[in-house]
Amino acid sequence: MCIRDRPYSVYGGRKGKNDYADDINTRSMMTNWLGGGSVYMPAMDGKRVPIELSLALHSDAGYNPDGQSTWGALAICTTDFNDGMLNSGISRFASKDFAKALRDNLVEDMTNTFGSFGKRYLWDRNYSETRLPEVPSAIIEMLSHQSFPDMRIAQDPMGKFTIARSIYKTILRFVSSNHDEPYVVQPLAPNHFSVEVDELGYASLTWNAQLDKTEPTAKPTSYIVYQAEGKGGFDNGTMVRSNIYNVKLEPGKLYNFRVAAVNQGGESFPSETLSALYNPT
């Protein structure tokens, strides 16, 4: 497939007269062009790429007069178009289910991490980004640039991670449900990681599983301990089943360690990196 052979109508529907409208519409039109002919868009011409969802992430505007509470998140879908049907023949209410799940799960995950997070509307309106895609589609609006409480979260790396993980979990659940398949969510990184070196030069690494309060399947089943020596990079890791790992250190050599959690959903981000040095006296 060559992306250069896409029709001009995909990205230039306004024929150069309105770049703003073309910019809004292009991603949806490209989705349809790529997915046309697949099982998700069988009645359209295209490249048969099996794209089954469309999601737009928008920063928001607005603030609460108290200056203390978050403006939160809202979601948007479009059901009143093409007789309420998508190209595959399924109802556009699948988009509403998707949008509602995105908003509700995001509010739950953010509230668990940061305290109360604003739950705003579920809009069923005529927006290009949810009208044009021929697969279930949604817009999620969040992180208002006019709201200081929201911007505190937006600039916090944990805020960005929590949002991204929440959206990942919703997409995984939604797709798995549509296919009637089980799912397992990737675990969170281990926490309370520590290393202690005894008088014989053995390093004892310990950590705790970090559980996802809103997703029981994210429990780790094993861990990977990564090790680096001296100025070298980390190795490919050692799989362990428990939350303790012992290793003999060579005198005078610096060691670096980090740990990742694993389950059937994948591997977590690594823990913080801890260093150990054995200098016998």
Question: Which role fits each region the language model picked out?
Answer:
Residues 1-5:
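Conserved small/polar residues in nucleotide/adenosyl-binding loops
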Residues 13-21, 42, 84-92, 150-157:
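Second-shell loop/turn segments in exported
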Residues 91-123:
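Active-site-adjacent substrate-binding region
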Residues 173-217, 266-281:
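Pro/Thr/Ser/Gly-rich low-complexity, intrinsically disordered linker/stalk tracts
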Residues 210-228, 234:
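Solvent-exposed loop/turn segments flanking beta-strands in beta-repeat/beta-sandwich domains
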Residues 235-242:
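Short beta-strand segments within Ig-like beta-sandwich modules, predominantly Fibronectin type-III
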